[in-house]
Amino acid sequence: MFIDRAKIYVKGGDGGNGIVAFRREKYVPDGGPSGGDGGKGGNVILEVDPGLKSLMDYKYNIHIKGKRGEHGQGSNQHGKSGQDKVIKVPPGTVVKEATSGKVLADLVHEHDSYIAAEGGRGGRGNTRFANPKNKAPRFSEDGKPGEEKWIVLELKVMAEVGLIGYPNVGKSTLLSQVTKASPKIDSYHFTTLNPNLGVVELEEGSRFVMADIPGLIEGAHQGRGLGDQFLRHIERTKMLIHVIDIASIEGRDPVLDIETINEELKGYNSRVMDKPQVIAANKMDLGDQAEENLQRLLDKVNSDEILIPEQYKKIFPISAATGEGLRELLDFVAEKVAQLPDTHDTFDIDLELPESEENTDTEQEALFTMSQDDKIEEKPKSDFGIRKEGDIFIVKHEKLEKILNEIDVHTEKGRHYFQAKVDEFGLEEALVDKGIKPGDTVKIGNVEFEYQ
């Protein structure tokens, strides 16, 4: 599952109260004030954890609060500050205001952090208010409430593998074959104007994000065609698959294409040439010309007649249309990607996600999320106690609460099981009857989630 959006409520801890207290001292009115200040409330802090890959945790745990500061004490003892609540997010998380959509933070690198909600200031004890006119004040100050708001977390996609090559060499077809993405494919130059992304998942558990980079032409590094905008996308990947039309369907020489594209990469930024790259000789299913061109390419590469980086000398004959050779290519790329360090560079665009037998989630749809648009089949009627407090619908249902106490909904199996029970008991139907709207919160036992 790849969840890339979550809406959460954050609240800094309230400040502790200052107190009224007096010490015992001869000739001093009431012994003199000695009320300590309250402690500051804890902040809610977002911090990048490179080990995280999704916003899964915040689909179920949407109310996050800092600890309250302790109250002051006598003898001018100040209350202890409340503990900060540090929540971990994956690299590439963008923080936005829920109402305006204003970007508050862009968390990319390890240990990047952002204070999402400030803790409240501690209240002042009566000692703070003593003055020549009032040497024994009998009042103090309460702590200030912590900052509170709804924020949206959005995870920008990190593409590990980029598909490069001339227009119409089959990059979009390759992406759609191996990731179940659905790029728009037409036979004219610059078909792909923005990178399309998809997730490649292999049986043994290997997984990486692949991006179809907009097509190149000669002179791109000087601004021709799509110019620098596609070259910047290339910089963000771990490695590249250079797709060529080995059958020369459009009359171009695939060997010359490789040299031309290399010159464009080198002209833009020589460091791009240091990225691991392999050649995918596509359209091998289209006749003898493909076989002849492949042999010519292999001969030139092996004899060093064609000046290409060493990493380009790994050539995979494939057909994106028929699937020929794709497994060998993907196995090699998956192994290489696992060995390479993360770039922490991101694509701020939508992600096409694959379907699997266990999970058919899409970009903003978690397994546990109930959608208004889903058709509800007839289910056994079940009695729910549902009451509304603000925008929170509190559900009382003995069996569902019992299930939540017995399973861990943070595991995939737990979520599958609980979602099945939610459907079985017809909870969504009952909530719709009560007037629930997208964005409202549903609470069952101690578990809260957002209705979408």
Curated annotation (Swiss-Prot):
Its main location: cytoplasm. The keyword Magnesium applies. Keywords: Cytoplasm, GTP-binding, Hydrolase, Magnesium, Metal-binding, Nucleotide-binding. Pfam families: DUF1967, GTP1_OBG, MMR_HSR1. GTP binds at residues 165-172, 190-194, 212-215, 282-285, 319-321. Monomer. Belongs to the TRAFAC class OBG-HflX-like GTPase superfamily. OBG GTPase family. It comes from Natranaerobius thermophilus (strain ATCC BAA-1301 / DSM 18059 / JW/NM-WN-LF). Mg(2+) binds at residues 172, 192. This is GTPase Obg. GO terms for molecular function: GTP binding; GTPase activity; magnesium ion binding. Residues 66-87, 117-143 are annotated as: Disordered. Coiled coil: none annotated. GO terms for cellular component: cytoplasm.
